[in-house]
């Protein structure tokens, strides 16, 4: 079963996709946010095209593990994604995924302008791989 990860932001949605076995995460794309209705329709079409069985949404927690405004927005968005796609939505702790993605892209020699374009989908990929590893019993989780 393929899993789609969404790293939600106010300007962009980072997207990552698992392989068909649900083992390996790979970057998919970055969706520039428009209206909520357009975003949900785009996600619905992606779910159908890639035969997604599960969706994982990054849940931004504070370093102390608390849920604040951004996390509540992510949960509200997740409920709408679940309704629009008909697929179950899980939430996964996304603390430090953007920092790790940025470091990875710097290590790869990506210029700042290119990093801005890629960091959201790389963060979604790290988020998804953490979720997949946890589901397989291989890693710590959220």
Task: Show which residues each predicted segment covers.
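Phosphate- and other anionic-substrate recognition elements at nucleic-acid/protein interfaces
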Residues: 1-6, 10-142
